[in-house]
Amino acid sequence: MQYLSPIEAVGLVKSGDTIVVQGSTSIPMVLLCALTERSSELRDVKVISGFGIHPEEAPYAKRELMDSFRALNIFVPNNLRRAMREGIADTIPCFLGEVPFLFRSGQVPVDVAFLNVSEPDENGYCSYGISADIAFSGAECAKTVIAQVNKYMPRTFGDPVIHVSQIAAICRGDEPLIEVPTPVPSEIETRIGNFIANEIPDGATLQIGVGGIPNAVINALSNHQHLGLHTEAITDGVLPLIEKGIIDNSLKKIYPGKSLGSLVLGSKHLYEYMDNNPDFVIRDVAFTNDPQNIRQNPKAMAINSAIEVDLTGQICADSIGETIISGVGGQHDFMYGAALSEGGKCFIALPSMTSKGQSKIVANLAPGAGVVTTRFQAQYIATEHGIVYLRNLPLAERAKALISIADPSVREDLERAAVKRFGIGFLRLK
């Protein structure tokens, strides 16, 4: 195996190519910066990224480089939000679990995959480490795989291995992995977390996201037993439950005894904890996010967030009005899978108000807002004022339930909107 310089490695990229880039906290920035250095030689290169976190903006997503590179996202990484606002980048609306199908079916042809992998083992296998998500299927379908080998990348079990013979060009890219601090839940988030935790039974299998509310839920599960983890993102928050044996994965049907995820977001401690740890399995999103796999786990619990919820139960989670700030991600995949699970439950958790004092329970979604979870899938909605169950409720009764967990300062306005929309049907409920 011969190591090339980064600029030599990306020399295999041609004009018109489509590149799939590994994400999570292991974006191969060495390769992307080298690619950008070739901008004068390249035209119409599409760069597709999934969820990712990096403090530096994507180097290829600049106005002056638009003839060379087109930035496309499945889920808008934090370092491409400015480019999205300015129209430099665009998004492909897609359920995350279906992205590998788009690659494998050829609907989105993949020419090149950029990876950030571990050192090869004695048999020549590199690990994708903390991010299989869309990278595994991207590399599987790519005509050319280019990788930066990173001494900081842990080795994980599951999908994430690739032999050096499958990699066309390799360079060194010893970048410390991005760390994501564990947020301390606020008082409001703690109240929301308690409402949700009270609905989670012993023996449940958890899909839980990232942020203050998910950590508040985790903190409230300290007296539970025999929980399982089948999720998209594994975070530091679950480690105390694993170390105490509260998450033991003993009742799961999919990978019993093991915690399953598709990517990892956390601290150096978490990355080191997972290194060569057979208690964790990392699979690509075609597996982790498949509702037919999720439903096999008993009491599957899908816990997700939202930007706003309207009075019929439509849930916006990817945009603020017309401005897309994230993506569908795995919310639909897990909400649907949990709904099909025996004893499963789906939760949407959000504060009742924004930091600017605007209600998140609204009469109608903002113009241009995307519906990530439809009113037909909505089950439990929780704010700091309570939790309500919407499934099978008629629209007027849904409105009444949602108003009850809105901030008290906006309830009268929401009631007037409900009367205007539902008429006597709403009035008869009072």
List the predicted regions and their residue ranges.
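Conserved alpha/beta enzyme-core scaffold
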Residues: 1-430
